[in-house]
Amino acid sequence: MGNSPSYNPPAGISPSDWLNLLQSAQRLNPRPSPSDFTDLKNYIHWFHKTQKKPWTFTSGGPASCPPGKFGRVPLVLATLNEVLSNDEGAPGASAPEEQPPPYDPPAVLPIISEGNRNRHRAWALRELQDIKKEIENKAPGSQVWIQTLRLAILQADPTPADLEQLCQYIASPVDQTAHMTSLTAAIAAEAANTLQGFNPKMGTLTQQSAQPNAGDLRSQYQNLWLQAWKNLPTRPSVQPWSTIVQGPAESYVEFVNRLQISLADNLPDGVPKEPIIDSLSYANANKECQQILQGRGLVAAPVGQKLQACAHWAPKTKQPAILVHTPGPKMPGPRQPAPKRPPPGPCYRCLKEGHWARDCPTKTTGPPPGPCPICKDPSHWKRDCPTLKSKN
């Protein structure tokens, strides 16, 4: 932005203190050059390296800068010391005697009228992009948010129309509406207390501060515009509608319902929601629903027709594998003995029926039917012959 360096602070200084130094540098006369900002950055590096601690307003006064080494940095420090030590220069700051020591100076510099304001210029697109980049991750109304906008205002001296353009570029529609409500209330309260240089007969504060010779009146409007950011009402965090995407297993009806709820919470009344819903209901749908809408030619159709097309869509779920036991060949078990066949007649040993001769009870108890064929002894069987045992 102009001759200003990046708002990101160098090593050795907090973002708030760095923005305060940049605001003080903007009040140099003649106006600051790129070399002034380079000297300011080199001074911070030197202070952090030599003092072994971060730069602060209390530790880095005008006496901390060696004369002649860093250009006009001593003048920047003197301006900062004068503004932060002046009770009237810091709106909302209490007098030192009303606070217990030590007295902490205000962390945000006010906009100071610099006499004839002939520095006004319209925003360039690159300036708006730089401002948005610096505060895109900051909460609206936070200290760094306000200080960054304050420094941008110092460099361009914007009119109410320029500030409205800036608001539309950096803030969401909901924050724009809340800020406008807060600004309108602040202007009404200040008008009742008679703004310096404000004449109700010549129009509203917005109209009068837009005039080329508005002077202090424009500065007061700019202060009110910044103050309105601090008074934004708190609201519950709602998921931005642009980040709502249909999940792979989420039904299309539930996805569209979440999208409609987010738009209702984020967009102010009067802003048409149908074009956004019609666009995002296809762009943020999952691939399967997009294929259905493409096949039916409903990419740019209203959301109602898309709901009818995808109402019965269901995600394809993978069925778990089921292990089925298939009977195989039977393994052979223990061999069962064959049923005994009854003998055809009486046992030839005992002449009784019902058993075979091999199972005859008299086989082991009775005398052998004849002499042993080996030793001719009639008292034992052949298997019990002593001659066989002696040979073994």
UniProtKB/Swiss-Prot annotation:
GO terms, molecular function: nucleic acid binding; structural constituent of virion; zinc ion binding
Annotated motif PPXY motif, positions: 100-103
One GO term (biological process): viral translational frameshifting
SMART domains given in the database record: ZnF_C2HC (SM00343)
The entry's keywords: Capsid protein, Host-virus interaction, Lipoprotein, Metal-binding, Myristate, Phosphoprotein, Repeat, Viral budding, Viral budding via the host ESCRT complexes, Viral matrix protein, Viral nucleoprotein, Viral release from host cell, Virion, Zinc, Zinc-finger
Lipidation (N-myristoyl glycine): G2
Annotated source species: Bovine leukemia virus (isolate Australian)
Start and end residues, zinc fingers (CCHC-type): 345-362, 370-387
Each Sequence repeat, start to end: 342-362, 367-387
Site entry (Cleavage), positions: L109, P110, L323, V324
Name of the protein this chain belongs to: Gag polyprotein
Residue ranges of the TM segments: none
Gene3D superfamilies given in the database record: 1.10.1200.30, Human Immunodeficiency Virus Type 1 Capsid Protein, Zinc finger, CCHC-type
